[in-house]
Curated annotation (Swiss-Prot):
The lineage of its organism: Eukaryota, Fungi, Dikarya, Ascomycota, Saccharomycotina. Its EC number is 2.3.1.225. This is Palmitoyltransferase ERF2. The active site is at C343 (s-palmitoyl cysteine intermediate). Residues 19-37, 44-60, 70-94 have a biased composition (Low complexity). Residues 1-176, 227-356, 431-514 are cytoplasmic. It is found in: Endoplasmic reticulum membrane. Autopalmitoylated. Residues 198-205, 378-409 are lumenal.
Length: 514
């Protein structure tokens, strides 16, 4: 009798035989060595082998399959990254070739466009456009909502030597070595040391009025320093006297981000100006009558030098006829009224509008140093005049120095600091007593007379026509009586389009050729 389970067992045997028949074929496909494959590219073999393995051998190890897939995927990813890097490299090389083909002006224009497209916050504009303003960076603010600029913002069309503060109210000169900051520190540090270490002792042992007087002199000296360092010394407007027929005007039109059209005029002086632009015009200061004058020293001087009066010259850099006693400062690149000198310790010119403050500044500095010197000596020697209790604590000068070391430091500082301001004050007292400027004294009085300036009797050709022949009157004019005047450049007024006073024009041709 046949068992019921016989057909089932036969079926199992058939399945087993079928599996054994398929397995070698599968093994042949999955165990082929890549080096012995008929394919030339192993990467192509791997990409074809994966679907065949999945279809024929579902019983393969999952770990083997995952490793095989990850190897293929990583190879594909590496190839894609390399292609992407090559594309980026090609794009960069193409951009470099395009940039090299551009001229310098186009590159600068591209940089300006990038800056204009950049949105600037209100705080950034407030700090860099009002609190501290450099006219050379005005292109950074072309995308502001308001198109009205101040004169100080457009000065020289981005080639200004000044930095403005508080909306054009104050200014200073851009310099590589800010010596004025060192000067300010030399004024502030001694006062701070005095306040910290000596003020309370002198308030108790001397008198409060002594402390108050020193603090007043110290504070007013700092005020005069800021006044001198940041005020207008008497700048004159530029480009007032230009030969119109020699001016070439070109208009550049640009469109801003606010869809507004900005017109900017470019000026250039072509050719050589007339000869009168390079002559020195002398205005006579004295009229003499040879028949009525005796052969005195004054009459000889007047007759010999009556033509050497007030000289008026043309400034080829500022393009203006300079008034009398006006000179061009190479540091400020401005013509200054009644120009005395350019002070590197204040980083500003000394002229008509701040010369009086300069004189009082020197006086206050000398008084402050002298006052500090005296009270420091009194504090160090106070033990000799003190009460019995204090004299028992401090009995010698060495003990006093150990007790008050800052007083000794301030004493030494005062002795050193009073030297230069004291000599400078004495020199300017002499100049103001003659009503003459430093520039006139060094150029015409101090230097040796030449044949062109010597009248034959050993006297110099320069005659100070501004001298009132009264020392007290000259001192009063310079220290108290002279008016500071008003600013002639109006930096805080609104800028009007096409105002040639604030344009950047090259010096006249004859000046550049010589």
């Amino acid at each position: 009798m046949v068992s019921p389970s016989s057909p089932e067992s036969n079926d199992d045997d058939d399945l087993t035989n079928a599996d054994s028949a398929i397995t070698p074929a599968t093994s042949t496909i999955t165990t082929d060595s890549p080096t012995k494959s008929s394919f030339d590219d192993y990467q192509s073999l791997s990409s074809i082998r994966i679907p065949i393995t999945r279809r024929i051998t579902p019983s393969l190890s999952p770990q083997y399959e995952e490793s095989n897939i990850s190897t293929t995927t990583s190879a594909t990813t590496t190839t894609t990254q390399q292609q992407h890097q090559q594309q980026q490299l090609q794009q960069q090389q193409q951009q470099l070739r395009q940039m090299s083909s551009l001229s310098a002006s186009k590159i600068e224009q591209a940089k300006t466009d990038v800056l204009n497209n950049k949105k600037i916050s209100f705080i950034h504009r407030f700090i860099t456009n009002w609190l501290i303003m450099d006219p050379n960076l005005i292109s950074h603010y072309n995308n502001t909502n308001t198109r009205r600029f101040k004169n100080y913002q457009i000065e020289n069309q981005g080639q200004s030597n000044f930095i403005y503060f508080l909306g054009g109210r104050l200014h200073t000169i851009k310099t590589k070595y800010p010596i004025n900051l060192i000067t300010l520190s030399l004024i502030i540090i001694p006062g701070i040391l005095y306040i910290i270490f000596e003020l309370s002792w002198q308030w108790r042992n001397f008198s409060p009025i002594i402390v108050i007087i020193f603090l007043y002199i110290w504070i007013i000296s700092i005020f005069h320093f800021f006044k001198l360092s940041t005020c207008d010394a008497g700048k004159l407007p530029k480009n007032i006297h230009l030969p119109k027929k020699l001016i070439t005007i070109t208009t550049t039109t640009t469109t801003t981000n606010d869809n507004e059209i900005d017109h900017r005029n470019n000026y250039k002086v072509m050719g050589s100006p007339p000869d009168e632009y390079f002559n020195t015009v002398t205005l006579p200061y004295w009229k003499t009558n040879n028949d009525n004058n005796d052969n005195t020293k004054i009459s000889k001087l007047a007759n010999a030098y009556h033509s050497h009066g007030v000289q008026v010259k043309y400034c080829g850099t500022c393009h203006i006829w300079r008034p009398s006693r006006t000179s061009h400062c190479n540091t400020c690149q401005q013509c200054i009224l009644n120009h005395d000198h350019h002070c590197i310790f204040l980083n500003n010119c000394i002229g008509q509008r701040n010369y009086k403050f300069f004189l009082w500044f020197l006086l206050y500095i000398v008084i402050a140093c002298l006052y500090l010197l005296i009270i420091s000596i009194l504090q160090l020697c106070h033990y000799k005049f003190a009460s019995h209790k204090e004299s028992e604590i401090i009995t010698t000068f060495n003990q006093s120095i150990k007790t008050h070391p800052i007083s000794l430091l301030l004493l030494i500082y005062s002795c050193l600091a009073i030297c230069y301001p004291g000599l400078l004050l004495a020199f300017h007292i002499f100049l103001t007593s003659q009503n003459i400027t430093t520039r006139e004294y060094l150029n015409f009085v101090y230097k040796k007379p030449s044949k062109s300036t010597d009248g034959g009797d050993g006297t110099r050709g320069f005659v100070n026509v501004y001298n009132t022949h009264s020392i007290w009157e000259n001192l009063y004019i310079n220290w108290l009586g002279k008016s500071n005047g008003v600013s002639l450049t109006f930096p805080r007024d609104y800028y009007h389009q096409g105002d040639i006073r604030f344009a950047n024009i090259e010096p006249l041709g004859t000046f550049t050729n010589k």
